[in-house]
Amino acid sequence: EVLYIPVTTDA
């Protein structure tokens, strides 16, 4: 299971 999802910053 995914415990941490990194924030993907698409500018």
Curated annotation (Swiss-Prot):
Subcellular localization, as worded in the UniProt entry: Secreted, Cell wall
Q: Which UniProt keywords apply?
A: Cell wall, Secreted
GO CC annotation: extracellular region
Q: What is this protein called?
A: 50 kDa cell wall protein
